[in-house]
Amino acid sequence: MDPLPEMMVVAAATGAQRVELYTEPYARAFATANESTMVERYAAAARSAQAAGLGVNAGHDLNRDNLPLFLAAVPGVAEVSIGHALIADALEWGLAATVRDYLRVMGDAA
């Protein structure tokens, strides 16, 4: 879902138990002048989702560089979907080392 706080209540009304925040806009804004504005949008959406009783997931274009800030700033993210970046990194560093590094990055951000 796009980071629109008002839509979290709508998602909850459908009977959903979780939402996945679509993070490509965050990834594009990462390390730019728009970064803090975008991070706050996601944080507000996550707070709204939690207030509506929803769990929060996130995914799309997350990677080892932009993931720590996202997890530190956006409350309650229970799960992230990182397919492309993880596999691309694994081709260079190996799957086991890459998974360990992502777990370290996520642990550092928690």
Provide a role label for each language-model segment:
Residues 1-48:
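Histidine/lysine/aspartate-rich catalytic loop segments that bind and position anionic ligands
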Residues 2-4, 24-26, 54-55, 59-65, ...:
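Active-site beta-loop-alpha junctions enriched in small/polar residues
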Residues 3-14, 62-77:
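Catalytic cores of alpha/beta
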Residues 18-30, 76-95:
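Glycine-rich phosphate-binding active-site loops on the catalytic face of alpha/beta enzymes
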Residues 26-27, 47-49, 84-87, 107-110:
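Short, surface-exposed, polar/charged, turn-prone segments marking secondary-structure boundaries
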Residues 31, 35, 89-110:
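C-terminal helical cap(s) of enzyme catalytic domains, especially alpha/beta-barrels
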Residues 37-41, 58-62, 72, 79, ...:
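Short amphipathic alpha-helical interaction segments
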